[in-house]
Amino acid sequence: MAQRTPRELRLRRHRRVRKKVSGTPQRPRLCVFRSNMHIYAQVIDDTVGRTLAAASTVEPELRASLAGKTKTERAKVVGAAIAERARAVGIECVVFDRGGFKYHGRIQALADAAREGGLKF
């Protein structure tokens, strides 16, 4: 029996969660992806397959404020930015999709910052 890689296990967890979690126009899905260097967050309406708001550490607007910060601090900045952008579009309540990642560290920091920014999970 072949050993599964951590990426395969994460994708398997993500598929299992996605069977049950779906974004609607009233309560879209806040989807998070974490790479070794960056973190990305999108607010998605799954009924039409449209991204309503997005924020990441690769954006030029956020990059200036991220210099010299740790990855967890960067996740907090992205969480605050996604909350601000979602509220600007009129979104108050979301379903959190952690993307198969553990709810710990950078994922938790992003979620907490989004909650502090006014999003309800």
Curated annotation (Swiss-Prot):
Q: Which GO terms describe its cellular component?
A: cytosolic large ribosomal subunit
**Record's protein name:** Large ribosomal subunit protein uL18
What organism is listed for this UniProt entry?
Roseiflexus castenholzii (strain DSM 13941 / HLO8)
The UniProt GO MF terms for this protein read: 5S rRNA binding; structural constituent of ribosome
Query: What start and end residues bound the annotated signal peptide?
Result: none
Cross-referenced InterPro entries: Ribosomal_uL18_bac-type, Ribosomal_uL18_bac/euk
Its assembly, as annotated, is:
Part of the 50S ribosomal subunit; part of the 5S rRNA/L5/L18/L25 subcomplex. Contacts the 5S and 23S rRNAs.
Keyword check for rRNA-binding = yes
Name the encoding gene, please. rplR
UniProt keyword list: Ribonucleoprotein, Ribosomal protein, RNA-binding, rRNA-binding
Task: Please verify whether the record's keywords include rRNA-binding.
Answer: yes
Function text: This is one of the proteins that bind and probably mediate the attachment of the 5S RNA into the large ribosomal subunit, where it forms part of the central protuberance.
- Write down the Pfam families for this protein, in alphabetical order: Ribosomal_L18p
Q: Which GO terms describe its biological process?
A: translation
Recorded family membership: Belongs to the universal ribosomal protein uL18 family.
